[in-house]
């Protein structure tokens, strides 16, 4: 049950208010319960959780626990219902002896937040101890000469209980000679005596056997008995008598051995031997008293012979007996009450409870680190203890309850600055001189993941040569994390992205632990000049922190691509090219042009052309442009020149070491108005003078007529099919409008999707032809023309297999990817931000594009019916707005068509197609036939260009 105050109601309310206020501030309180000793296991003591204001559900999460310095196992708390119950046998006499007050002091501790409550459980005495006499049989010698009324002192019984349970009454078996006499003095100490009622007659009854019963005041009553064996003597009829029955003495603790405590004195009225007195301790004295005090049997002096400790026992009760030497001997008893005076001889004690280590560095202020209890076995001022802490530390001591301190966080922690603290707690008492004790507390600061991995640089630049071996180590990234343990374990990974059509992880990888970056495949400068990506460093903390670093990997070019020849009508790899030259041409006439490309870049792709000297050292009337590859005459031809010349042109780049290729050109000199008579095979490969000539003009006229007729028939057939075919969605049906822009250099069709399906008469439209935006401003399109578009944009069309007629062979792809060919072919590049028009650098250093440029001839390991688009190598030249490529490839045609118009007064032949002899005459005839028609077309084209530029 709860402790209740029995004082004035007003004072009681005031005191309770103060206690509640103090408990709310320090997080602790005090409860009082009572329980009877010898209670059974499980006996209810009190609803401690309810009385402390704690919910049952929070007892376990808050680590509800009960602590006691000496008797922690006597009481226990049921965490399910919050009831304090008896856990083991409670013996009040064992706990407190004969002390009037007996209590068990408990400390109840709960965490989150840390709170301490003081609980005092009063142990109530029950009548569980029966009175006990010092001896079960007492021998008493009484002289027959004793007068009736004589009193014989007896040792009374003792009861370990207190209060009414220890109040004893005595009874004696009925006898005619004796009666019991019980006297009570001021100290509530009973003196038991046997009183003689009438004279004894030793001759009648030499011995008397009496039974004395002691009855306590408990309910139910308990009794104890002793037997008196009385021997009747005929001598010594006076017993010794003490001056005082009770002696009160004070003694300082730690008194040295031999210190006199008190001298007791007794006298005997007898004479002779019957008056000689011997002093002794009562036979029921405890072993503790016998070990600490000495009684002189002659003079009755009590002195110290052991260690006297106030903290062990605050007082002693010593029973002294005086016995004479008569026959029979007679005795008397007295009591010495010894009070021990305390001195400051005990050092304070510190005990650290509930040490919460390690402490997180982000712990909030006022976080409780530990609970410290102090105690001093001394009393009064000597037992008053104060605590202090090492200065200049981010902690402080807060007094939460009497003799209890909390070690709390006073300022923020930073493990990266200080990872541990060695604290010294000093406890000092109030004695004079004061005593103190210290305790060390090692506080380790636990790491919190508050630092992200950091790179020494935000960006790294790496240079790697192309054609590196797979798995080559190209760089190592390293990040440092200021945290500790797993919070500082850094792992590396790629920040995945797309590089063109491929994932970044197909190019490079990074080792998760070491940060080493590896190239997973050989890098090709011609394909990829700069690889820019990010590496992420992430620690293993919770939550993880990370940072990124940018790596710019520049792929350095190596001279790993030899020049590739692009020549018309090649019979095979290394085959010769035949050209017919009229003898009437003058100096500087361009006979042919050797075209070569190099897939490398820079100096490795800078090509130079050299004409090998003729056989026998003969001088030939031809030369080759060092950087243009144009074969031209050095002088006017005459009749003495041999009709056939075999020219060897060496093409080499400027790499280290340089790579070369050789082209063979067969030049045949013909008379004006004549044509070869031999077959095309003989004219291409034969070198003898027996080859015949045919009239070029006749063949040209026939070819023009045939082509014109075929074109007219095709247009008629196409118109008929368009008119008769039902409008369907797909082949030639209406689709998204396609923008057609015209300029002086030609027309380009494109849509925003940049993939078009071209209708070409019968059959489904082909999606193999890809046209890219030349970055021209859009031209206005009328509704009529929009409806007549032949190009249908189909965004939902499924990808189709490319036409095998439109593929290059493996040997030509490298050439088609080179910077020269890409510029001359007008290849459109697509950048990372979207398709745009970019013109590669002219590696061959040609000042201006040339006319009459042809594609590789069939039979030289190249399929002329091919089509390709590819990124060009490094250092691309950005085209300006409105620019168009000067040439592009028409699939299925052996020539590269030029769409750039040159000035009319150009000195170099800019014909779109290669002529087979008499180029000048043929051009003059064409100009005469077309007349003003050609001039009108040019004016129309210029007008269109002006509109497009606007």
Swiss-Prot record:
SMART domains tied to this protein: CA
Map the PXXP repeats onto residue numbers: 734-737, 774-777, 799-802, 832-835, 873-876, 891-894
- Could you list this entry's UniProt keywords, alphabetically sorted: Calcium, Cell adhesion, Cell membrane, Glycoprotein, Membrane, Repeat, Signal, Transmembrane, Transmembrane helix
User: What is its membrane topology?
Assistant: Single-pass type I membrane protein
In terms of Pfam families, this protein maps to: Cadherin (PF00028), Cadherin_2 (PF08266), Cadherin_tail (PF15974)
Q: Tell me the GO molecular function terms.
A: calcium ion binding
Q: InterPro entries attached here?
A: Cadherin-like_dom, Cadherin-like_sf, Cadherin_CBD, Cadherin_CS, Cadherin_N, Protocadherin/Cadherin-CA
User: So which residues have sugars stuck on them?
Assistant: 257, 265, 548
Q: Which residues lie on this side of the membrane: Cytoplasmic?
A: 719-950
Segments on the Extracellular face: 30-697
Q: What does this protein do?
A: Potential calcium-dependent cell-adhesion protein. May be involved in the establishment and maintenance of specific neuronal connections in the brain.
Protein name (Swiss-Prot/TrEMBL): Protocadherin alpha-3
Task: Give the source species.
Answer: Pan troglodytes
Its gene?
PCDHA3
């Amino acid at each position: 049950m709860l402790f209740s105050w029995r004082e004035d109601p007003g004072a009681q309310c005031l005191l309770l208010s103060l206690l509640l206020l103090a408990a709310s501030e320090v997080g602790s309180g005090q409860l009082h319960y009572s329980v009877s000793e010898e209670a059974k296991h499980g006996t209810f003591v009190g609803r401690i959780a309810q009385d402390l204001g704690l919910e049952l559900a929070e007892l376990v999460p808050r680590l509800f626990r009960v602590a006691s310095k000496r008797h922690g196992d006597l009481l226990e708390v049921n965490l399910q219902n919050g009831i304090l119950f008896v856990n083991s046998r409670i013996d009040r006499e064992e706990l407190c002896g004969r002390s009037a007050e007996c209590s068990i002091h408990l400390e109840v501790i709960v965490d989150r937040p840390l709170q301490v409550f003081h609980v005092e459980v009063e142990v109530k005495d029950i009548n569980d101890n029966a009175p006990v006499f010092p001896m079960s049989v007492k021998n008493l010698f009484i002289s027959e000469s004793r007068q009736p009324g004589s009193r014989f002192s007896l040792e009374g019984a003792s009861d370990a209980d207190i209060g009414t349970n220890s109040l004893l009454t005595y009874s004696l078996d009925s006898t005619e000679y004796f009666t019991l006499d019980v006297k009570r003095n001021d100290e509530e100490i009973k003196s038991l005596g046997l009183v003689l009622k009438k004279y004894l007659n030793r001759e009648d009854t030499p011995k008397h056997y009496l039974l004395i019963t002691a009855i306590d005041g408990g309910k139910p009553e308990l009794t104890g008995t002793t037997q008196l064996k009385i021997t009747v003597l005929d001598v010594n009829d006076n017993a010794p008598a003490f001056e005082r029955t009770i002696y009160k003495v004070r003694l300082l603790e730690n008194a040295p051995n031999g210190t006199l405590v008190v001298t007791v004195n007794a006298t005997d009225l007898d004479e002779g031997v019957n008056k000689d007195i011997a002093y002794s301790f009562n036979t029921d004295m405890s072993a503790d008293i016998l070990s600490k005090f000495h009684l002189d049997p002659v003079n009755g002096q009590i002195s110290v012979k052991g260690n006297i400790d106030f903290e062990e026992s605050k007082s002693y009760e010593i029973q002294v007996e005086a016995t004479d030497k008569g026959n029979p001997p007679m005795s008397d008893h007295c009591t010495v009450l010894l009070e021990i005076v305390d001195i400051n001889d005990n050092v304070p004690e510190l005990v650290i409870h509930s040490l919460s280590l390690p402490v997180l560095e982000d712990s909030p202020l006022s976080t409780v680190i530990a609970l410290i209890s102090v105690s001093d076995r001394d009393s009064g001022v000597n037992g008053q203890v104060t605590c202090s802490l090492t200065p200049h530390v981010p902690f402080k001591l807060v007094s939460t309850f009497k003799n209890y301190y909390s070690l709390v966080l006073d300022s923020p922690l930073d493990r990266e600055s200080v990872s541990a603290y060695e604290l010294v707690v000093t406890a000092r008492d109030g004695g004079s001189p004061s005593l103190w004790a210290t305790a060390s507390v090692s506080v380790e600061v636990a790491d919190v993941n508050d630092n992200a991995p950091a790179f020494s640089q935000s960006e790294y630049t790496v240079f790697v040569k192309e054609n590196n071996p797979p798995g080559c180590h190209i760089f190592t990234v390293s990040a440092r994390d200021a945290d500790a343990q797993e919070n500082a374990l850094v792992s590396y990974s790629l920040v995945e992205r797309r590089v063109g059509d491929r994932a970044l992880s197909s190019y490079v990888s990074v080792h998760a632990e070491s940060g080493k970056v590896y190239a997973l495949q050989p890098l090709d400068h011609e394909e990829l000049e700069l690889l820019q990506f990010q590496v992420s460093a992430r620690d293993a903390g919770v939550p993880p922190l990370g940072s990124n670093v940018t790596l710019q990997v520049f792929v350095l070019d190596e001279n790993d691509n030899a020049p590739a020849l692009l020549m018309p009508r090649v019979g095979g790899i290394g085959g010769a090219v035949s050209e017919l030259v009229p003898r009437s041409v003058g100096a500087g006439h361009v006979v042919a042009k050797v075209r070569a490309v190099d897939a490398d870049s820079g100096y490795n792709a800078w090509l130079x052309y050299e004409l090998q000297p003729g056989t026998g050292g003969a001088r030939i009337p031809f030369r080759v442009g060092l950087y243009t590859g144009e074969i031209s005459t050095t002088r006017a031809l005459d009749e003495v020149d041999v009709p056939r010349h075999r020219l060897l042109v060496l093409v080499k780049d400027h790499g280290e070491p340089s790579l070369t290729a050789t082209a063979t050109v067969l030049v045949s000199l013909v008379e004006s108005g004549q044509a070869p008579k031999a077959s095309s095979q003989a004219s291409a490969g034969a070198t003898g003078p027996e080859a015949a000539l045919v009239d070029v003009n006749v063949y040209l006229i026939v070819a023009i007529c045939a082509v014109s007729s075929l074109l007219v028939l095709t247009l008629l057939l196409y118109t008929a099919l368009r008119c008769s075919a039902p409008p369907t969605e797909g082949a030639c049906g209406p689709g998204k409008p396609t923008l057609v822009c015209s300029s002086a250099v030609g027309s380009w069709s494109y849509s925003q999707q940049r993939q078009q399906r071209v209708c070409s008469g019968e059959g489904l439209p082909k999606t193999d032809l890809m046209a890219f935006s030349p970055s021209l401003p859009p031209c206005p399109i009328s509704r009529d023309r929009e409806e007549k578009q032949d190009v249908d944009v189909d965004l939902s069309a499924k990808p189709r297999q490319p036409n095998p007629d439109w593929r290059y062979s493996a040997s030509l792809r490298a050439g088609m990817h080179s910077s020269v060919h890409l510029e001359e072919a007008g290849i459109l590049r697509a950048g990372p931000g979207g398709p745009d028009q970019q013109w590669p650098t002219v590696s061959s250093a040609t000042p201006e594009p040339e006319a009459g440029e042809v594609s590789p001839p069939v039979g030289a390991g190249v399929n002329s019916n091919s089509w390709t688009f590819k990124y060009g190598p490094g250092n691309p030249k950005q085209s300006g707005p409105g620019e168009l490529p000067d040439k592009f490839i028409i699939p299925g045609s052996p020539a590269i068509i030029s769409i750039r118009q040159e000035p009319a007064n150009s000195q170099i032949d800019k014909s779109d197609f290669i002529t087979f002899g008499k180029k000048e005459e043929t051009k003059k005839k064409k100009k005469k036939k077309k007349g003003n028609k050609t001039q009108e077309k040019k004016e129309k084209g210029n007008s269109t260009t002006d509109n497009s530029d606007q």
